[in-house]
Amino acid sequence: MEKNGYKPNAITCGTILNALCKIGQTSMAIRLLRKMEEGNFELHLSVYNIIIDSLCKDRLVTEALNLLFEMMSKGIQPDLVSYNSLIQGLCNFSLWREAITLLNEMTQRKIVPCVRTFSILVDTYCKEGMLIEAKKVFDMMIQRGIEPNVVSYNTLIDGYCLQNKLKDAIEALNMMVERGCSPDVVSYNTLINGFCKKKRIDEAMNFFHEMSNKGVTPDVVTYNTLIGGFCRVERHKAALELFHKM
């Protein structure tokens, strides 16, 4: 491009940088960023956010944090997108303490967390088996006026099922419905799987009928889980009947 007498501008370089990150060429994107800095381009927050997110996806969270500090030293302040990428990156390494620190930091900066911010933290706590902490973050989200979505509820339901806290999982489903969030096939599949693992196949079937009555279409995961559940309790005839209904 430059050989033909055309000098790339910030928009051109930003587009290329975004493309590089999307194909996993983060190191090349950083080299382009350095060239942009050398060329005295006016760098916007969006450029840094693209690379921070890409570094986090590459599990290079330390490098992402360093870029955040570098960006801030240049007077460019992070936004919700910046923090969500970093919180996700930290949580991928189960660094939930550091993630909570960032949550507190963004609050101090008057940056309002969104449902994704809280859902990331709920998911991390659930995977760590820290259900009390997961519920606290979930409740904090509601207290701050942020309505959980189906992903948030499914994450909490899954956390309870993983720890065999099926009563709590049902309560989470009921709260979901009460607050006007419609359960989806994942919500029911998670509960059905939890009950099948505990050999409570009749209760699992109750959820199967409930989802059908509410217009939620069972998928192959639903049927496979229930068929496996019937086989686990040696009700092979029922398993075969369900197989023929697929």
Predicted regions and their residues:
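Short, intrinsically disordered, charge-balanced linker/junction segments flanking boundaries
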Residues: 240-246
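Pentatricopeptide repeat
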Residues: 9-14, 18, 29, 44-49, ...
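Methionine-biased hydrophobic packing positions in alpha-helices, especially
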Residues: 1, 36, 71-72, 106, ...
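Leucine-rich repeat
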Residues: 1, 5-6, 10, 16, ...
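A broad helix-preferring feature
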Residues: 20-23, 163, 168, 198, ...
